[in-house]
Structure formats: C-alpha cells, structure tokens
Regions:
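Core catalytic alpha/beta fold that binds nucleotide/phospho-ligands
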Residues: 1-141
C-alpha cells in the first residue's frame, strides 16, 4: 500500500507490478492534497505549467497541477521512469499516452476528473477508459 501524505516523496521511488490481466484504479480527492501543489509543480513539464497558468480560477489551476503531478507519479511507479522524465504524446482528442520509447511495458492509462475528484486506470496490453462525474441532486418540482 502506498500512502499519500504531506511528504509526497514517500510516494516516489516505489514500484508496483501490473499483471497482464489486471486493472488498477486509483481515486483521489484533489482538494485534500492541494497543499502538495508546489511539489507537484516541480515535476510538471514546461507545457503543463503554461497550460496550468491559463486557468481563470485558482482552484482549477491547483486541481490541474495536482492531477498532472499525480499522473506523473503513478506512471513513475509503474515504469521506473522519473516523474519529471515522463514524456507524453497526444492523440487527436488530446488523450495523453506515453511516448513509444518509454512504453516498453505496453502500459495503457486513462484519467477522468470532475470538480475535485480524479480517477486513473491502468492496464497492460489493453486499452482502458475511465469516466467520473459528480452526482448532482435533482431539483424537486
């Protein structure tokens, strides 16, 4: 079990094996780890930092930085590549994947977030899709 706490470096330098027939799903409340934003900023790419600074609302910027930082940390523990060294390629819809040179593991991942909630799924040798939506109460008529 990997614990996420205020010392996020406890989370780094770990290794998790993903079996060929396994699916790993990670769920996070981004607001509960927003205090780690400065540490996450240090592992983001320049492009990710530019994108983060385009958000109008600070809470959206913080959530973006935390979600990308978490994605990089998770990819690092599956691949052994440093969090900062992870490089992405994007499909025509903007979905990220590891560049081919870094993906000798046939690792596939997908992430989704809604407000403060983020979910990331990982598989080997198969595509994966995850989707989360926060439920909104129905109005009484």
């Amino acid at each position: 079990m990997i614990k996420m706490n205020k010392r996020f470096y406890n989370f780094q330098n770990q290794k998790i094996e993903l079996g060929a027939n396994e699916v790993h799903i990670w769920n996070f409340d981004l607001d509960k780890i927003s205090s780690l934003m400065n540490e996450f900023e240090n592992i983001l790419s320049d492009d990710e930092l530019v994108r983060a600074n385009k958000f109008h609302f600070e809470i959206d910027k913080v959530r973006f930085i935390c979600s990308r930082g978490l994605l990089r940390l998770l990819l690092s523990i599956y691949t052994g590549i440093s969090s900062r060294g992870i490089n992405f390629t994007f499909n025509e819809y903007g979905k990220p994947s590891l560049i081919e040179a870094q993906n000798n593991f046939e690792l596939h991942f997908n992430l989704s977030h809604s407000k403060n909630f983020m979910s990331v799924g990982f598989t080997k040798n198969a595509l994966i899709g995850v989707d989360v939506e926060l439920m909104k109460p129905l109005k009484n008529h």
